[in-house]
C-alpha cells in the first residue's frame, strides 16, 4: 500500500536527482556561460582582432570592420541557437532525449578547443565559427533538457525539476561573470581560457550521463519497448511497482495513435493543438521581447549614472547575477506550491511595473539627483520578476501542454521563436535606444502587459495534472471532442470530467 502511495506522489530519488543535475550542468550551464563569457573580455578580444589583422595586412583594422566583426562574434550565438532549435525534432526522435544531449556535446567540446587555441593560431575566425557552434549547442540543450527532465519526473515534481535548467543557465551566467573579473581571466592572457572552459561541463556529461536512464515515455511510446521503459521507471522511482505510471503512459500512447507522427507543418494545421501552439508562441516570444536582454544591456550605464566607479561595475553586475540565481532557486521551491500560471502572472506584472518606473527614472535622472538609485532598484526588481516566471516557466509548459508525438515539433517551434526573438532584440535595441532614449522601455512594458493579459485569459494551471489531463483542458478551447480526435470535428458533447476542469 505504501509503495502504491509512493508511485502516485513520486519522490526525488538519488538517480532522478543526479540525472537532473548532470543533464542541467552539462548542457544548460553552458548556455548561460556562453551568454556572458564574451562580455567582460570584449576589449581584449577586440584588441586581439586588431593585432591579428595588423600582422596579416600591416595596417590597423578600420573601426567599421572591427565593429562588424565583433557584432558577428556576438550575434553568431543566437543565430546558432536558432539553427540548433531546428535540429531538435530530428535528434530527439532518432537518438532519444538522452542520446540527443550526448550528441550535442560535440558542439561544445570542439568550439572550446578552437576558442582556447585561437590566440595561439592567430585566428579570430576560429572564435566567430566557435560562437556559431556553441550557439547550436545552446539551441539544442535549451529545448532537449526541459523535455528530458519533464519526461523523467513524476507529476508532483515536474515543475520543480523543470525549473532546474533555468537555474543552471543563471549559474552559468554568474560563473562567467565571476571568472570574467579583470583580476581572474578577463585580461590579455586569460580570455582564451575563459572561452575554452565551456568544454569542461560537456566532458563531464559525456562521461556520466550514459549511466542514467533514457526517458521512459520515449522508450514506450516511440521505441515500443515496454520492458526497457519499465526498467527505466523502476530505476528512477526506486521501487519495483510502477504499473500505475506505466498505465498512464500507455493511455497517452493510445490517445496519440490517431495523430501519428506530427511534423512542424502538421502541428500548425491541427485544430486539436491550436491554443497550445498559440500559447507556446506567446510565452516564448514574451519571454525574450519583454526586455530582459535590454535590461542587462542598459544595466552598466545605469550603474555608472548612479555613481558606481567604472572599475566596480563588474562587481555590481555579478551581484545582479547572484540575485538572478537566488530567485531561480526560490522558484524551484514555490512552483509546485503556487503553480505555473500564478508565477507567470506575478513575473510579467513585476516586469511591467519595473519597466514603467525605470522609464520615468531614466527620463528624470538629470533633473532629480536620487533618480539613478531608483533605476538600480528597477533593474533588480525586473531581474527578480523575470526569474520568478518569464525565464523558467515557458520551457516547462511546452513539456506539459503537448503530448509525446507533438512535443519535439513544439520544441522546434518554441525554440525557434525564443532564439529569433533574442536575436531581434539584440539587433534592434541599440537603434530603439538611439531613437527613443529613456522611453525605450515603454515598448517592453507594453509587451509585458499584453502577455500578462493573454496568460490571465487563456493559459490554464498545469500543476499536479497528467499530460493527458492538461490536454483535455484545451479541448474546449480548441473546439474538438478529444485530445487527438480522428477527425477535427467541432465541439459536441464533452465528457463531464473535462467540462469540470
From Swiss-Prot:
Annotated tissue distribution: Detected at the apical membrane of villi in the jejunum. Detected in jejunum mucosa. Detected in epididymis and whole testis (at protein level). Detected in small intestine, kidney and testis. Detected in cochlea, but not in inner or outer cochlear hair cells.
Presence of the UniProt keyword Zinc-finger in the record: no
Record organism: Mus musculus
Mutant lacking the gene: phenotype: Mice fed a standard diet appear normal and healthy, and display no visible phenotype. Mutant mice show reduced food intake when kept on a high-frucose diet and about 28% reduction of their body weight within seven days. They loose more weight than wild-type mice that receive similar amounts of high-fructose food. Mutant mice show strongly decreased fructose absorption in the jejunum. Contrary to wild-type, mutant mice have a strongly distended colon and caecum when kept on a high-fructose diet. Their intestines look normal when they are fed a standard diet.
Subcellular location: Apical cell membrane; Cell membrane; Cell membrane, Sarcolemma
Family the entry assigns: Belongs to the major facilitator superfamily. Sugar transporter (TC 2.A.1.1) family. Glucose transporter subfamily.
Domain of life of the organism encoding this protein: Eukaryota
Protein name listed in UniProt: Solute carrier family 2, facilitated glucose transporter member 5
InterPro entries in UniProt: Fru_transpt_5, GLUT, MFS_dom, MFS_sugar_transport-like, MFS_trans_sf, Sugar/inositol_transpt, Sugar_transporter_CS
Amino acid at each position: 500500500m505504501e509503495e502504491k502511495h509512493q508511485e502516485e506522489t513520486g519522490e526525488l530519488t538519488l538517480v532522478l536527482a543526479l540525472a537532473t543535475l548532470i543533464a542541467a550542468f552539462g548542457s544548460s550551464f553552458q548556455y548561460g556561460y556562453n551568454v556572458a563569457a564574451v562580455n567582460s573580455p570584449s576589449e581584449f578580444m577586440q584588441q586581439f582582432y586588431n593585432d591579428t589583422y595588423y600582422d596579416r595586412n600591416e595596417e590597423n583594422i578600420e573601426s567599421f570592420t572591427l565593429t562588424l566583426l565583433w557584432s558577428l562574434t556576438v550575434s553568431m550565438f543566437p543565430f546558432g541557437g536558432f539553427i540548433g532549435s531546428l535540429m531538435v525534432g530530428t535528434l530527439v526522435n532518432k537518438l532519444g532525449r538522452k542520446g540527443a544531449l550526448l550528441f550535442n556535446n560535440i558542439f561544445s567540446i570542439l568550439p572550446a578547443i578552437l576558442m582556447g587555441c585561437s590566440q595561439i593560431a592567430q585566428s579570430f575566425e576560429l572564435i566567430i565559427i566557435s560562437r556559431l557552434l556553441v550557439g547550436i549547442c545552446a539551441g539544442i540543450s535549451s529545448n532537449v533538457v526541459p523535455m528530458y527532465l519533464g519526461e523523467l519526473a513524476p507529476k508532483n515534481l515536474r515543475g520543480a525539476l523543470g525549473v532546474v535548467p533555468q537555474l543552471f543557465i543563471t549559474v552559468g551566467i554568474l560563473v562567467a561573470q565571476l571568472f570574467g573579473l579583470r583580476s581572474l581571466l578577463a585580461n590579455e592572457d586569460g580570455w582564451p581560457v575563459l572561452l575554452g572552459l565551456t568544454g569542461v561541463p560537456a566532458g563531464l556529461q559525456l562521461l556520466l550521463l550514459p549511466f542514467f536512464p533514457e526517458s521512459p515515455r520515449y522508450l514506450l511510446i516511440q521505441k515500443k519497448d515496454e520492458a526497457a521503459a519499465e526498467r527505466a521507471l523502476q530505476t528512477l522511482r526506486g521501487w519495483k511497482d510502477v504499473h500505475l505510471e506505466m498505465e498512464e503512459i500507455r493511455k497517452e500512447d493510445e490517445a496519440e495513435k490517431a495523430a501519428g507522427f506530427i511534423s512542424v507543418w502538421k502541428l500548425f494545421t491541427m485544430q486539436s493543438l491550436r491554443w497550445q501552439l498559440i500559447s507556446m508562441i506567446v510565452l516564448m516570444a514574451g519571454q525574450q521581447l519583454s526586455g530582459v536582454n535590454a535590461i542587462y544591456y542598459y544595466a552598466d550605464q545605469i550603474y555608472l549614472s548612479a555613481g558606481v566607479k567604472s572599475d566596480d561595475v563588474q562587481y555590481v553586475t555579478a551581484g545582479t547575477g547572484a540575485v538572478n540565481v537566488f530567485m531561480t532557486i526560490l522558484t524551484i521551491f514555490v512552483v509546485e506550491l503556487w503553480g505555473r500560471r500564478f508565477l507567470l502572472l506575478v513575473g510579467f506584472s513585476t516586469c511591467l511595473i519595473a519597466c514603467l518606473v525605470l522609464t520615468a527614472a531614466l527620463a528624470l535622472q538629470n533633473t532629480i539627483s536620487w533618480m539613478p538609485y531608483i533605476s538600480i532598484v528597477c533593474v533588480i526588481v525586473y531581474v527578480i520578476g523575470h526569474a520568478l516566471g518569464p525565464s523558467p516557466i515557458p520551457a516547462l509548459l511546452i513539456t506539459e501542454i503537448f503530448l509525446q508525438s507533438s512535443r519535439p515539433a513544439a520544441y522546434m517551434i518554441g525554440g525557434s521563436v525564443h532564439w529569433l526573438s533574442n536575436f531581434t532584440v539584440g539587433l534592434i535595441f541599440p537603434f530603439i535606444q538611439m531613437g527613443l532614449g529613456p522611453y525605450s522601455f515603454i515598448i517592453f512594458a507594453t509587451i509585458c502587459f499584453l502577455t500578462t493579459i493573454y496568460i490571465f485569459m487563456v493559459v490554464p494551471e498545469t500543476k499536479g495534472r497528467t499530460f493527458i489531463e492538461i490536454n483535455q483542458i484545451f479541448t474546449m478551447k480548441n473546439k474538438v471532442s478529444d485530445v487527438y480526435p480522428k477527425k477535427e470535428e467541432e465541439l459536441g458533447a464533452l465528457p463531464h470530467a473535462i467540462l469540470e476542469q
